[in-house]
C-alpha cells in the first residue's frame, strides 16, 4: 500500500509582501520605511470581541503570538476605510510611526502595525497596543461615580493619576512632541493603576463624541483646546498644558464633561471673555490653583510640565498617608431609622448589598432598629478599623436617635474637613473606632 502524507507548508515572513501591502495603502515611501520594523505578521494576530466602536472605527481585543512564550493580550485599533481618504490613512499610521520609539512608563508603547486585506481585497491598517485591564481613565472615573455600586476613589489616587500624566507629558515635551488631544479619554490605566498617556491623534479617528466640526475645519475637541489654538489653529507645548488643566478638572470631578451648560460653538466666546472652568465641588484650593494656572491667556505665562509635576507631587506629599494597605471600600445602603412602634429585627443580609456579601460581617454594624423612613449610611471599611457616617433628611434634632458606637471608648464627633466627595447640606456625625484623630472621606 502507498502511504499518503498531507501537510501544510509553514508560512514564512516575507518582507517583500509586507512592502507591497504597505504600498497598496497609498502611504508615502518614507512612512513605509518607518513602519518596516514594527509591522506584525497578520498570522500572529488573532482578533476577539469589540471593546469599543464609533463612527470612524473600532477597538478590538486581540492576542498576539510570541516567538517564545504565551500569547500577549492586546488592543487593536482599526479604521472604517469607506470613510477615509489615503491622506487620512497616512495620518493614522503616521501617529503610530511617531510613538514607536517612545520609552517611558507613563507613555503607551506601540507594539506594532498590522495590515489586513478585507473581503474586497482592500488593505486595512490596524494599530496594535498593549491591552489595558481598566480601560481609559475617563471611563474608569465615570464607573467609579455612576455605577450601581459606586467605588470610592481617594484624593491621593486622583492626584497620583495627575502626577502620572504630568510625567508622561514631561517626557513627550522633552522630545518636542505635541499631543494635541490630551484628555482623560486618551489616558489609559495599567493593571497596577498607573496612568499612561495614549492616543496621539488616533482617538479622533475612532471616537467622535467629544469632537466638533466648525465649517470646513477638521473635527476638534474644542472643550480641551487652548484659546489661542481655537483662534489661530496654532499648537505648542503650552497648548498641551492647557489641555492638561482640563484633564485635571475631569479627574477632580470624576469624569464630568467640561463646561457643563456651555455648547461647543459657544466655547471660544466664553473663554475670550475671561471665563474658565469653575472650581469642582470639594476641590482643594491648592489643586484648583494648579489647574487654573494652565488656563492663563498668555501661553508663556503657563507652567511647564516639569513645574506642574513638582507642584502636584508636593501637594500629594502634603496629604495624610493612606490608612491601610488595602483600598478603601465604601458600602452605600439604606438603614431604617428607629421606630418605637416597630419591633422588626433585621439581619445582616438586609444591610449588605448582594455585591458586597463577601465582606466580613464583623466590620459592619448591625442595625438595632427599624423605621419606614430611610437614612443613607456610608460604611468605610479599612485595615485600621471601621467608620460609620450617617446622613438623614433635614437637620439633626435633640431627640434624634444616635446609633450605638462600634467600639468602647468611641465618641461622636463632627466632620470638619471633607477633601473628597459629594457636597453636604450640613456636617455629619461620624463614629470612629480608631484611637487617633482622622477625617471622614465621603
UniProtKB/Swiss-Prot annotation:
The miscellaneous comment for this protein is: This protein is synthesized as an Env-Ryk polyprotein. An Env-Ryk precursor fusion protein is first synthesized and then cellular protease cleaves this precursor into gp85 and the putative oncogene termed gp69 (gp37-Ryk).
**MF (Gene Ontology):** ATP binding; transmembrane receptor protein tyrosine kinase activity
Gene that codes for this? V-RYK
- Has UniProt tagged this entry with the keyword rRNA-binding? no
| Pfam families hit by this protein | PK_Tyr_Ser-Thr (PF07714)
* Top-level taxon of the source organism: Viruses
Q: Where is the active site?
A: 181
Protein name according to UniProt: Tyrosine-protein kinase transforming protein RYK
Amino acid at each position: 500500500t502507498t502511504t499518503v502524507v498531507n501537510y501544510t507548508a509553514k508560512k514564512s515572513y516575507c518582507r517583500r509582501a509586507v512592502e507591497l501591502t504597505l504600498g497598496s495603502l497609498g502611504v508615502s515611501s518614507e512612512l513605509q520605511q518607518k513602519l518596516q520594523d514594527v509591522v506584525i505578521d497578520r498570522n500572529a494576530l488573532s482578533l476577539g470581541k469589540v471593546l469599543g466602536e464609533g463612527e470612524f472605527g473600532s477597538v478590538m481585543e486581540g492576542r498576539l503570538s510570541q516567538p517564545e512564550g504565551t500569547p500577549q493580550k492586546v488592543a487593536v485599533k482599526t479604521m472604517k476605510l469607506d470613510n477615509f481618504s489615503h491622506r487620512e490613512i497616512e495620518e493614522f499610521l503616521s501617529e503610530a510611526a511617531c510613538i514607536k520609539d517612545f520609552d517611558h512608563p507613563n507613555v503607551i508603547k506601540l507594539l506594532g502595525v498590522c495590515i489586513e486585506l478585507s473581503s474586497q481585497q482592500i488593505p486595512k491598517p490596524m494599530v496594535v497596543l498593549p491591552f489595558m485591564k481598566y480601560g481609559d481613565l475617563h471611563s474608569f472615573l465615570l464607573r467609579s461615580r455612576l455605577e450601581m455600586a459606586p467605588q470610592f476613589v481617594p484624593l491621593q489616587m486622583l492626584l497620583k493619576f495627575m502626577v502620572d500624566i504630568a510625567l508622561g507629558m514631561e517626557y513627550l515635551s522633552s522630545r518636542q512632541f505635541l499631543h494635541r488631544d490630551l484628555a482623560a479619554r486618551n489616558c489609559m490605566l495599567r493593571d497596577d493603576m498607573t496612568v499612561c498617556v495614549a492616543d496621539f491623534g488616533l482617538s479622533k479617528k475612532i471616537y467622535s463624541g467629544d469632537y466638533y466640526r466648525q465649517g470646513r475645519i477638521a473635527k476638534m475637541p474644542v472643550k480641551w483646546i487652548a484659546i489661542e489654538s481655537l483662534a489661530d489653529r496654532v499648537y505648542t507645548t503650552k497648548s498641551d498644558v492647557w489641555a492638561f488643566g482640563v484633564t485635571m478638572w475631569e479627574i477632580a470631578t470624576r469624569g464630568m464633561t467640561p463646561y457643563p451648560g456651555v455648547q461647543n460653538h459657544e466655547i471660544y466666546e466664553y473663554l475670550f471673555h475671561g471665563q474658565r472652568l469653575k472650581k469642582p465641588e470639594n476641590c482643594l484650593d491648592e489643586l484648583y490653583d494648579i489647574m487654573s494656572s494652565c488656563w492663563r491667556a498668555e501661553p508663556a505665562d503657563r507652567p511647564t510640565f516639569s513645574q506642574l509635576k513638582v507642584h502636584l507631587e508636593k501637594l500629594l506629599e502634603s496629604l495624610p498617608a493612606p490608612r491601610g494597605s488595602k483600598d478603601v471600600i465604601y458600602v452605600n445602603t439604606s438603614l431604617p431609622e428607629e421606630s418605637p412602634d416597630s419591633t422588626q429585627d433585621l439581619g445582616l443580609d438586609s444591610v449588605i448589598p448582594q455585591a458586597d456579601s463577601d465582606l466580613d460581617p464583623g466590620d459592619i454594624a448591625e442595625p438595632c432598629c427599624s423605621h419606614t423612613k430611610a437614612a443613607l449610611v456610608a460604611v468605610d471599611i479599612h485595615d485600621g478599623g471601621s467608620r460609620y457616617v450617617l446622613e438623614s433628611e433635614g437637620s439633626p434634632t435633640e431627640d434624634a436617635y444616635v446609633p450605638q458606637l462600634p467600639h468602647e471608648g468611641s465618641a461622636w464627633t463632627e466632620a470638619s474637613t471633607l477633601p473628597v466627595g459629594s457636597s453636604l447640606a450640613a456636617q455629619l456625625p461620624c463614629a470612629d473606632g480608631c484611637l487617633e484623630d482622622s477625617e471622614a472621606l465621603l
